[in-house]
From Swiss-Prot:
Keywords: Cytoplasm, Hypusine, Initiation factor, Protein biosynthesis. One of its GO terms (cellular component) is cytoplasm. InterPro entries: IF5A-like, IF5A-like_N, NA-bd_OB-fold, Rib_uL2_dom2, Trans_elong_IF5A_hypusine_site, Transl_elong_IF5A_arc, Transl_elong_IF5A_C, Translation_prot_SH3-like_sf. This is Translation initiation factor 5A. The keyword rRNA-binding does not apply. It comes from the Archaea. One of its GO terms (biological process) is positive regulation of translational termination.
Amino acid sequence: MAREQTEVRELDEGSYVMIEDTPCKINSYSTAKPGKHGSAKARIDAKGVFDGKKRSLSQPVDAKVWVPIVNRKQGQVVSTDGNDAQVMDLDTYDTFTMRVPEDIDLQPDDEIEYLQYEEQRKITRS
């Protein structure tokens, strides 16, 4: 699995964290100390990278959480078919099919940037 373990206090807004076994990008991060003898707690609000669902996590700041290793890669569109595009990775020359977001218009030979975590991929910009 492409993930590593880290403490909650080392996370920042914009970084990635695993919530409910889903890679999520952190939208907001806040800490609060509950009292004189209590340990600080962190509240994280995040959005799923591949499914877009909002999730939250509340943990002590010294708790360990999994951080996914999400790779940003370059690809070239080979062909398009409705909402799907056949993309070739520019580093490994692997070819695979990806779902095209509605707000992106792709043509063959366009170069794109996409995120990849294990077997999940998402086009971020063209």
